[in-house]
Amino acid sequence: KGVLHGIAAALPVFEEKDSGQFVNISSVGDRWVGPTSTVYSATKFAVRAISDGLRQEVSRNIRVALIAPGATESELPNTISDPELKKMAIETFRKETISGLAIAKAVAFAIAQPEDVDVNELVVRPTAQKNL
């Protein structure tokens, strides 16, 4: 719901100014569904669909960017309920993660574009991450 609440709060201001930029954060999980990740992937796909629909519905002066991080240093592996998958995810994350700073730089890249350029989607993942 956070993405929807953010849009609801900012959209009237952006429409009044006829200018603004949304930057929504999804995940590479919006492109892939695996065992035990169905609900997670569904929520991330929803963010992707909302972002794409919003981009098509708003004024041409309002930009909508979607950043889809791959394996990023976070608490995500700790939320996995299956013990085997959790152990595997933690081991993988130790070897194949990028920092939050890398994601912040992707956001900065999207924002820094000229006003007539909209970075619709940007997937950012570690070079070591081959799946997802």
Predicted regions and their residues:
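A short helix-coil junction within the Rossmann-fold of NAD(P)-dependent oxidoreductases
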Residues: A9-D18
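Alpha-helical segment proximal to the catalytic Tyr-Lys
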Residues: P12, D52, Q56-R60
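Conserved Rossmann-fold SDR core element
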Residues: G20-F22, R48, V58-T72, D118-E121
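Active-site loop immediately N-terminal to the catalytic Tyr-X3-Lys motif
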Residues: W32-T38
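Short beta-loop-alpha junction of Rossmann-like oxidoreductase domains
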Residues: A71-I80
